[in-house]
């Protein structure tokens, strides 16, 4: 099968790290990038240098109005309206929508006007079908033109929840994600009309926040619909987050059996998506980890045979972007 040719709309944290993952894996070929707020020279600089993931090891240059990475030319567009981006002129059949702005079927489908065959939204969507690699890809229908890769937190939680529900059954559960700082937060206190706490300085505070990640699991695993909800704490770290899933199980069990089930999944059907560790790890140990979710066996606790707290780490930038690449490649293989 030919390598899928892809365009990226939005060259922010996810857009740039998706491009790094595309180059490193070779699963997709990025042929065009659109961002109305970043000119070509600045685009090259932002891709080459990264405070979290380090300097890009290959060559990065600009030539003839194009971004050239490791000798591969990428067309650059600066359109504000997605409908005006001529993806077909660059040969891009699939578009990764990573602005964080066009997250509905209607708005994201504007890319189809420029010649895209399918749009993959790198964020949760209110109405586009959501897919989590390792969890519900078998539900994908090639007729779907706009799909979502869900959120980084849903990608961490869903594989873990699937293993636990399939093996022991989940009656109900609460999730907390202790989440690294993201670009929407403020460096110092500033206005944030809809979320007053979210306007407080990111580096000075632990900030309680809402998240739809747990409820979204019910969309990708229908058996868990209405059984999970959750919240977030935004913390002053640059990257890597951790999910705390506390559940009431349908079947009584012990923690050793829970560990064994997750370990088996991590070495079998969810290999590469769900990781497993018994080491005494901390957040920075997972920076640049390709997994969606890495279960921390020594961090979880059990109160009773049916009540347990499970802990799983994720690089909310790198691991998620790796899955975006996987999802694009998978959907292209079905066309």
From Swiss-Prot:
It holds the Pfam family Gp_dh_N. It is found in: Cytoplasm. GO terms for cellular component: cytosol. The modification Phosphothreonine is found at residues 153-154, 182, 184, 211, 237. PROSITE patterns: GAPDH. GO terms for biological process: canonical glycolysis; glycolytic process. It is an enzyme of class 1 (oxidoreductase). Keywords: Cytoplasm, Glycolysis, NAD, Oxidoreductase, Phosphoprotein. Pathway: Carbohydrate degradation; glycolysis; pyruvate from D-glyceraldehyde 3-phosphate: step 1/5. The record marks 179 as: Activates thiol group during catalysis. InterPro entries: GlycerAld/Erythrose_P_DH (IPR020831), GlycerAld_3-P_DH_AS (IPR020830), GlycerAld_3-P_DH_cat (IPR020829), GlycerAld_3-P_DH_NAD(P)-bd (IPR020828), Glyceraldehyde-3-P_DH_1 (IPR006424), NAD(P)-bd_dom_sf (IPR036291). Belongs to the glyceraldehyde-3-phosphate dehydrogenase family. This is Glyceraldehyde-3-phosphate dehydrogenase 2. It comes from Schizosaccharomyces pombe (strain 972 / ATCC 24843) (Fission yeast). The lineage of its organism: Eukaryota, Fungi, Dikarya, Ascomycota, Taphrinomycotina.
